[in-house]
Regions:
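N-terminal low-structure segments adjacent to metalloprotease catalytic domains
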Residues: 1-39
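Short, charge-rich amphipathic segments
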Residues: 1-11, 102-103, 184-191
């Protein structure tokens, strides 16, 4: 089951974001007092901007590998759904802990206790929880198609069968990091 963000007015979204930032600031202060500071850092390339609170020592490799994966996925997405013009830089927010992801979702207007990531078109963010790297990458393969489709077609009102069908299709590709390519695997499973 996949969760989608509800529409929130810009003014309400701004208030929610400010509340979240105060909450994160309080969490960071508490974490800092306990020796576990939550610091966000960003890495960009031509296609994506990653913002994360992962420990930089381990997180830099995860983010670099994720950027490579998403670059390979983008080629596949473009083959099946060619973009209509220039694409915006995709924003990806990676959370170290699911509890922080849930707090962020709650602060931005959605209580979400089940998902470990999603594409939020209202905030133009792909959100991912990285507690389990394998689950994070599977979620990223799926949700990044929603993000791509939104930017590639300059709209967000796609038929659910098309949007979810393609996202599920790309969720199951096999990635070859040495060649930075994806391979479609048809297991015969159908929705």
């Amino acid at each position: 089951e996949f969760a989608f963000a509800e529409t929130v007015s810009p003014a309400a979204a701004q208030k929610l974001l400010q509340a979240f930032e105060r909450s994160v600031s309080a969490s960071a202060s508490a974490a800092s007092a306990s020796g576990r500071a939550m610091k966000w850092w960003e890495t960009k390339n031509a296609q994506y901007a990653f913002l994360t609170d992962l420990d930089p020592a381990k997180g830099k490799k995860f983010v670099a590998d994720s950027m490579k994966l998403m670059t390979a996925l983008r080629k596949g997405f473009e083959y099946y759904v060619p973009p209509k013009g220039e694409m915006a830089v995709g924003k990806v927010r990676v959370f170290r802990r699911k509890a922080d992801y849930q707090a962020y979702r709650k602060a931005t207007g959605t209580v979400d206790l089940q998902s470990c990531g999603l594409w939020d078109p209202n905030r133009d963010e792909l959100l991912i929880v990285a507690e389990s790297p394998e689950e994070a990458l599977a979620t990223m393969r799926h949700e990044s198609f929603h993000q791509y489709l939104h930017y590639a077609t300059k709209r967000g009102d796609h038929a659910p069968w098309f949007n979810e069908g393609h996202a599920t299709f790309f969720e199951n590709v096999k990635y070859n990091p040495a060649k930075n390519t994806i391979r479609v695997i048809d297991t015969g499973n159908r929705a």
